């Protein structure tokens, strides 16, 4: 799976769970904040995290859950899509994150970093884009086959405050954007800190 993102300090602690692995063969999709990815077999999809993502659907070609909706269920072709993620404009423009992975057989990944399920005859799925919290698509993984399900996307921590409140005291080299409708936006894609 991808890496969790954690925001803590001043008595506040928030964890954004990363996207899950894809399901493989008869194994269920792995759990993740963006919901489980598309299962490659009849077992259940991965579990989403309350307030962050929906569950993946059950069934061989089912999609994984996204941040805004559950995955689409199906035990036959065509493979089902992963649930879409949620759009946020905290950075000044709309960006969708935490999409669910598509079901095996080429099911499309949900909007927001979910990757497609593996096409028939292709047992591997791609890693999710970094800092999206998306979930990887499902694979078939029949008996005796070696399969590789992609990693879920790592998360991101974004802070927004009035320009007049920004102290400039940061570590970890976050991206800093000022003048975003009168606000300063800090984007952390790795370890770092901000002191007001």
Language-model segments: residues:
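Low-complexity, glycine/proline-biased repetitive segments and flexible coils/loops
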Residues: 1-196
């Amino acid at each position: 799976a991808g890496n969790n993102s954690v925001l803590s300090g001043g008595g506040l602690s928030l964890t954004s769970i990363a996207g899950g692995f894809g399901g493989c063969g008869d194994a269920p999709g792995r759990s993740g904040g963006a919901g489980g990815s598309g299962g490659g077999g009849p077992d259940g999809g991965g579990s989403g995290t309350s307030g962050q993502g929906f569950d993946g659907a059950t069934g061989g070609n089912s999609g994984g859950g996204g941040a805004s909706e559950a995955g689409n269920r199906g035990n036959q072709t065509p493979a089902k899509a992963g649930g879409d993620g949620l759009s946020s404009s905290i950075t000044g423009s709309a960006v969708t994150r935490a999409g669910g992975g598509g079901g095996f057989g080429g099911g499309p990944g949900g909007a927001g970093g979910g990757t497609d399920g593996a096409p028939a005859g292709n047992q591997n799925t791609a890693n999710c884009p970094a800092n999206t919290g998306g979930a990887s698509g499902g694979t078939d993984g029949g008996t005796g086959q070696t399969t590789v399900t992609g990693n879920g996307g790592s998360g991101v921590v974004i802070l927004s405050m009035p320009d007049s409140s920004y102290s400039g005291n940061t570590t970890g080299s976050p991206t800093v954007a000022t003048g975003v409708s009168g606000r300063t936006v800090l984007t952390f894609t790795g370890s770092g800190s901000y002191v007001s």
